[in-house]
């Protein structure tokens, strides 16, 4: 069928539906708000599916249900309807002889797929043993002027699914399941941290100085203050101010914004968990993370084995822990990379160029080691792995390692070759932090758009004393991708960023 023919068919069907709505208006309010349901489809199935037909009949269970008409099969003086609510689907049996006179012909006969109705009736089992509501009262609650996307195959066009998520949720059970899982991930995280004595807080989304991560920010202007402001790229510096102030365990579940590329793993607006714990180090946080992910897996999937595409991730086993240098040497040996290459700037430049990496002038040895890791090792970290000991150059907020000050007490969590989280023992030496901010300013002046801004007030806060602290950020969208087995970040964000048509 051509696009033009489809448009004509759509216009014709909408015209018929509008005529039906006009007739309803003539009778009164076509959008009543007096119906109150007392049952959801999922609960009815859970409570009564196992009952035999005679036993169910003897109980005379009366229910009120409401939802959207997804299918209908007219059979003379009766119609079978599939009703969908937020929990699932239930079958309705609407027969002329069970309704007041004239209702079946005048009302039920005017219903269309997509209409929202409320019904009252008793439960029974059909000859095929399907739980069904025998309707004795019916009411149209909302007339749908547009038809459902595809009566037989659901909504399959990917772009339409993202642009018109409401249609996707109506038509695709898998999409509804995905966002239920996402909600459970967030609820599970919140429950975990509250149970550990953490306090949930909110920090500014609009910031004078964007900090806490290396990323390009969105810029806006505050008219009343006549000052440029930034959508936050991370809440880190504000959360650590709270630890200075005496809130020793804090967490925030909220949005971050980064004015960067869009991909199957990146959206400019995304949700993060960040939490900070005083009198803890990065080893404690790795332990927390393992415990949290195991709990989420059990609560959401009922198992610590998490399927993802053709892979399976085992959250039940201890997560591997490996340093960045060791990961490069382990997976880069076949490319001829040796230990000495990672401790000498010129040798690291040579390795990077051999790997086809375009070396930036602003990079020092630490940045070179990082890009070499990304090229040769990152995609090998399939099972849950904590990557540790990142160079200080790329970790401006992390505490230096006592044994090797060139690296930091930092970790990143990788699952399926993708970074899921980032944490470290916090730098609480105000003078060291000030020097690292200055180095970031120099990098920005040298052309690094993602280098951090200097936050003088944060340095002042550190001068008042930050207790030994560790903090971590976990990407909620990427966690949701894992637990929902979703291939793209757009599949787990209700309304992802899209280019305008």
Swiss-Prot record:
Record-level Gene Ontology MF annotations: ATP binding; lysine-tRNA ligase activity; magnesium ion binding; tRNA binding
Enzyme class: ligase
Cofactor binding note of this UniProt entry: Binds 3 Mg(2+) ions per subunit.
Annotated signal peptide: none
PANTHER family hit by this protein: LYSINE--TRNA LIGASE, CHLOROPLASTIC_MITOCHONDRIAL, LYSYL-TRNA SYNTHETASE
Subunit structure: Homodimer.
UniProt-recorded name of the protein: Lysine--tRNA ligase
Broad class of the protein's primary localization: cytoplasm
KW Signal (keyword) present: no
Its EC number(s): 6.1.1.6
UniProt binding sites for Mg(2+) 1: 412, 419
Cofactor requirements of the protein: Mg(2+)
């Amino acid at each position: 069928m051509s696009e033009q023919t489809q448009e004509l068919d759509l216009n014709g069907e909408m015209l018929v539906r509008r005529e039906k709505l006009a007739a309803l208006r003539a009778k009164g309010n076509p959008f009543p708000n007096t119906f109150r349901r007392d049952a959801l489809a999922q609960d009815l199935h859970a409570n009564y599916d196992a009952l035999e037909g005679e036993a169910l009949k003897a109980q005379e269970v009366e229910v009120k249900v409401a939802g959207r008409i997804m299918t209908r099969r007219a059979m003379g003086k009766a119609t079978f309807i599939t009703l969908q609510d937020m929990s699932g689907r239930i079958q309705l049996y609407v027969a002329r002889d069970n309704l007041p006179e004239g209702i079946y012909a005048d009302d039920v006969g005017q219903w269309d797929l997509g209409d929202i109705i409320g019904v009252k009736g008793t439960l029974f089992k059909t000859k095929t043993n399907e739980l069904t509501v025998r309707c004795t009262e019916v009411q149209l609650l909302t007339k749908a002027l547009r038809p459902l996307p595809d009566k037989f195959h659901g909504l399959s066009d990917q772009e339409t699914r993202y642009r018109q998520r409401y249609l996707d949720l109506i038509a695709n059970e898998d999409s509804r399941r995905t966002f239920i899982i996402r909600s459970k991930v967030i609820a599970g995280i919140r429950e975990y941290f509250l149970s550990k004595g953490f306090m949930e807080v909110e920090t500014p989304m609009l910031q004078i100085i964007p900090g806490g991560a290396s990323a390009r920010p969105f810029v806006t202007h505050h008219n009343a203050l006549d000052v440029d402001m930034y959508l936050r790229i991370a809440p880190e510096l504000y959360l650590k101010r709270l630890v200075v102030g005496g809130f020793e365990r804090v967490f925030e579940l909220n949005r971050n914004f980064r004015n960067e590329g869009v991909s199957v793993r990146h959206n400019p607006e995304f949700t993060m968990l960040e939490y900070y714990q005083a009198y803890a180090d990065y080893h404690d946080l790795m332990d927390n993370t393992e415990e949290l992910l195991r709990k989420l897996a059990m609560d959401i999937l009922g198992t610590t084995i998490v399927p993802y595409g053709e892979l399976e991730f085992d959250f039940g086993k201890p997560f591997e822990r490996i340093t960045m240098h060791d990961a490069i040497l382990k997976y880069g040996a076949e490319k001829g990379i040796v230990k000495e290459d990672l401790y000498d700037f010129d040798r690291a430049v040579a390795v990077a160029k051999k790997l086809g990496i375009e070396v930036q002038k602003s990079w020092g040895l630490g940045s070179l080691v990082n890009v070499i890791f990304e090229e040769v090792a990152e995609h090998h970290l399939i099972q849950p792995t904590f990557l540790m000991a990142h160079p200080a150059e790329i970790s401006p907020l992390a505490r230096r390692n006592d044994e090797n000050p060139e690296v930091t007490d930092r970790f990143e969590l990788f699952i399926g070759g993708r970074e899921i989280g980032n944490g470290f023992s916090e730098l609480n030496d105000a003078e060291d932090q000030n020097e690292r901010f200055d180095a970031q300013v120099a990098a920005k002046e040298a052309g690094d758009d993602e280098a951090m801004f200097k936050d003088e007030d944060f340095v002042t806060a550190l001068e008042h004393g930050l207790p030994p602290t560790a903090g971590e950020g976990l990407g909620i969208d990427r966690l949701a991708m894992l637990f929902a087995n979703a291939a793209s970040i757009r599949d787990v964000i209700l309304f992802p960023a899209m280019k305008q048509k």
